[in-house]
């Protein structure tokens, strides 16, 4: 399924045990993100969504499950990231961005957060999502209008331009992540769709000012070992150029 046997086994266990915990509240489980696009590699987050009949508030058993899985030897166990979302909320874009039970990459605990409650997540799930259990994702999510994606992208662009100027968390992970994410946002603004990181950067290399091409190419090349890079300082020259890039594109 994913091309990684140990990840397939982990996902199968996750789905089986979540289904057992939720019982008749379980609707389905899905992969989104890089694995849905078919561009994942050994450094990718494992983006999942569990769809439920209602907002799950009794989290004790799920918390225990995620804490246990996080302790497994396979590195994939520390890179699960996803939310538990009611089918009624998932169906169409939620203007309120209701917080959901969310497992962050690297975390062993669910927290209440709207991370997956976005137009982008719905679009990726509907158009590319992989069903681990339950009906096809297209049966659960209405088409996401391009203008909804563009509206969200405009807000995201402002947020990321602001984040570029926050000095306290600059590191070797943030710098290329910011460049790639800005390329994805710009592609969505231009085309009203959502594509993979690689496809968005390829688009950027065709469409953006050549000044930014070395920055985009570098961001693609330094992808391996994101955890290690998180604890390393960002290259000062790349940091300055990334801030300039964020400022320039946020004025488009």
What does each model-found stretch correspond to?
Residues 1-29, 58-61:
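Helical scaffold of the NTase/Pol beta-like nucleotidyltransferase catalytic core
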Residues 123-252:
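Conserved nucleotidyltransferase catalytic core and NTase-mimicking acidic/glycine-rich helix/loop elements
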Residues 29-68, 79-86:
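Catalytic metal-binding acidic patch
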Residues 1-3, 64-172, 179:
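Conserved NTP/Mg2+-binding pocket subregion across the NTase superfamily
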Residues 36, 89, 184-187:
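Short, solvent-exposed loop/turn segments at secondary-structure junctions
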């Amino acid at each position: 399924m994913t091309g990684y046997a140990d990840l397939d086994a982990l996902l199968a266990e996750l789905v089986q045990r979540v289904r057992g915990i939720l019982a008749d509240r379980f609707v389905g489980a899905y992969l989104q993100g890089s694995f849905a696009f078919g561009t994942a590699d050994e450094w990718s987050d494992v983006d999942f969504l569990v769809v439920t009949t209602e907002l799950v508030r009794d989290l004790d058993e799920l918390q225990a499950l995620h804490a246990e899985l996080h302790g497994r030897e396979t590195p994939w166990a520390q890179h699960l990231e996803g939310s538990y979302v009611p089918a009624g909320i998932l169906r169409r874009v939620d203007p309120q961005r209701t917080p959901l039970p969310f497992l962050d990459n690297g975390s062993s605990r669910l927290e209440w957060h709207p991370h997956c409650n976005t137009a982008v997540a719905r679009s990726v799930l509907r158009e590319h999502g992989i069903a681990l259990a339950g009906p096809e994702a297209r049966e659960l999510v209405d088409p996401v209008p391009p203008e909804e994606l563009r509206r969200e992208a405009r807000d995201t662009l402002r947020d990321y331009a602001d984040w570029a100027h926050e000095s306290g968390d600059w590191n070797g992970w943030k710098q290329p992540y910011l460049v790639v994410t800005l390329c994805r946002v710009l592609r969505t603004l231009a085309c009203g769709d959502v594509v993979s990181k690689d496809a968005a950067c390829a688009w950027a290399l065709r469409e953006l000012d050549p000044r930014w091409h070395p920055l985009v190419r570098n961001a693609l090349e330094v992808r391996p070992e994101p955890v290690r890079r998180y604890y390393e300082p960002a290259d000062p020259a790349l940091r300055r150029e990334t801030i300039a890039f964020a400022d320039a594109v946020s004025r488009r």
